[in-house]
Amino acid sequence: MKLLSKIMIIALATSMLQACNGPGGMNKQGTGTLLGGAGGALLGSQFGKGKGQLVGVGVGALLGAVLGGQIGAGMDEQDRRLAELTSQRALETAPSGSNVEWRNPDNGNYGYVTPNKTYRNSTGQYCREYTQTVVIGGKQQKAYGNACRQPDGQWQVVN
């Protein structure tokens, strides 16, 4: 629990600093960095024990912050909304290996979700491996993960 508290303090401090960015508050890159760092730290905390776990948190936070900042620098709210809706649709209905694309006509950014292997986790939930690809300003970024179907029908990323 102490580790989670430290992560929350870092996330809160970062968001407070980002709020000082000016009248608009937190920008897209700051938001991406914050969310990527927090997600990376949380993922990193799942590995190792003691000092090894702290190393995992640090590495996860750093990698997540870098990737999140790069993606957030170019993605706007509409991009994120389109990507999330497409992810939900792809995970629920698309056959493994098929690409389900989204495209923002206002800025030309686009991406696609490729669901892969479907399996049941230890609690019986349906889960899927997937690849998320986004192209922002002509630069492609890929992320790999797993998501599980929740009782309400929504898919939640588990790593």
From Swiss-Prot:
InterPro entries in alphabetical order: Anti_2, Gly_zipper_2TM_dom, Surface_antigen_Rickettsia
Pfam families in the cross-refs: 17kDa_Anti_2, Rick_17kDa_Anti
Cellular localization per UniProt: Cell outer membrane
GO cellular component, one term: cell outer membrane
Source species, domain of life: Bacteria
Membrane topology: Lipid-anchor
Cleaved signal peptide residues: 1-19
Annotated lipid attachment (N-palmitoyl cysteine): 20
PROSITE patterns, alphabetized: PROKAR_LIPOPROTEIN
The UniProt record lists the keyword Repeat: no
Lipid-acceptor residues (S-diacylglycerol cysteine): 20
Keyword tags: Cell outer membrane, Lipoprotein, Membrane, Palmitate, Signal
Keyword field contains Cell membrane: no
Family (UniProt): Belongs to the rickettsiale 17 kDa surface antigen family.
Protein name: 17 kDa surface antigen
